Amino acid sequence: MKSQLLSLAVAVSTISQGVVGQEPFGWPFKPMVTQDDLQNKIKLKDIMAGIEKLQSFSDAHPEKNRVFGGNGHKDTVEWIYNELKATGYYNVKKQEQVHLWSHAEAALSANGKDLKASAMSYSPPANKIMAELVVAKNNGCNATDYPENTQGKIVLIQRGVCSFGEKSSQAGDAKAIGAVVYNNVPGSLAGTLGGLDKRHVPTAGLSQEDGKNLASLVASGKVDVTMNVVSLFENRTTWNVIAETKGGDHNNVVMLGAHSDSVDAGPGINDNGSGSIGIMTVAKALTNFKLNNAVRFAWWTAEEFGLLGSTFYVDSLDDRELHKVKLYLNFDMIGSPNFANQIYDGDGSAYNMTGPAGSAEIEYLFEKFFDDQGLPHQPTAFTGRSDYSAFIKRNVPAGGLFTGAEVVKTPEQVKLFGGEAGVAYDKNYHGKGDTVANINKGAIFLNTRAIAYSVAEYARSLKGFPTRPKTGKRAVNPQYAKMPGGGCGHHTVFM
């Protein structure tokens, strides 16, 4: 009897570890993953429990945020790591890195009237500089956009086309002593220059209304501006969390990710606790199944400061390793209170920016998810404003979902998705009000099920998916070479 029990124990152990040559994909006693079965494992109560957990990490510390390198984010990273490690289903690692954190505050007045301004992170400081205001043409992305008399002045620039960092650099090249960027959509504007640059000048953001008013004043007379920017800088150690299924073909990796950090201003529960918990919920549900292709989940750090964690990760892979990643799915803000179901425009049909080969197929898959349920959806552009940026620059097919940030919802969109016209998709975007109460439960549940739908599809098979061409070491697709490399979310305000 003892020998029989010993034999049985050895057999069970062998099965649980996977027998090389007999069951290459592991977990033979589990059913093969299907779209319906994985979606059925997604429960709203599990999603909201995770959302509440992230809120608790913010609440536990005086900063009341989960900004990278801070205590709230450290708690987030440890929890994600431990939760996944405990499943036994994943090989989990923390990828350590050091990045420069920046926090800036601005005060701005024009002709003695105070304006509500936000300093761009990584802005050089300004000690109450006073100068005449001039207005850049177009979007301030080219040297020819700046008036000949820009030297020694503060320049007003409209948001759009290029990054805030490039606008600040162009202003510096034109010998301006400061730059004020105003929004091109209703609402205030806070953003980042994406990093330090000697060409940058002190830079602040203004609302569309205030910016247009200033431009009108300049057109009719002289405007004197006083600008003060206080900037703090600190090198901080932080981590990505990477979890890859032990089972599945590790030469055909399906990868998905979401950033785990917040801005300084608040806990970041929609931005991007929603995406973080969405993929976490799917990762836990996936442990009930076996699969054919390995699935790699990533929680990126320091996205809000220039996509730093995802860029660090992609840069750490040579072309041979990156070629194993057959596609990348990005989920950034999937629980917006005034949501719209938006899918990255992989085929370029809406925004004339086509993703690498395979991106169109990803878009079509998500379209099918919504179409099969009779639900509306719309495309959203590949702007480079989220963690997919580093992947598409290296020709990795990408796609994903987004429910909206600072952009105002139109009456036409209300007819499709409900909600309130004239109000931002997320009125608490990048603010202290981005709490649990900011989450639209219907939106986050639907989009998490969509994540499960896509993961099950590609974990089972990549049949019909375009084959990735092999390229040289660290080759960058020239179509995306000038895409901004810093920011905070698809929504990220660095451009």
Swiss-Prot record:
Enzyme Commission numbers on file: 3.4.11.-
Cofactors that this protein relies on: Zn(2+)
GO biological processes: proteolysis
Active-site residues (renumbered): E303 (proton acceptor)
Keywords tagged on the record: Aminopeptidase, Glycoprotein, Hydrolase, Metal-binding, Metalloprotease, Protease, Secreted, Signal, Virulence, Zinc
Subunit structure: Monomer.
Full protein name: Leucine aminopeptidase 2
Organism, scientific name: Trichophyton tonsurans (Scalp ringworm fungus)
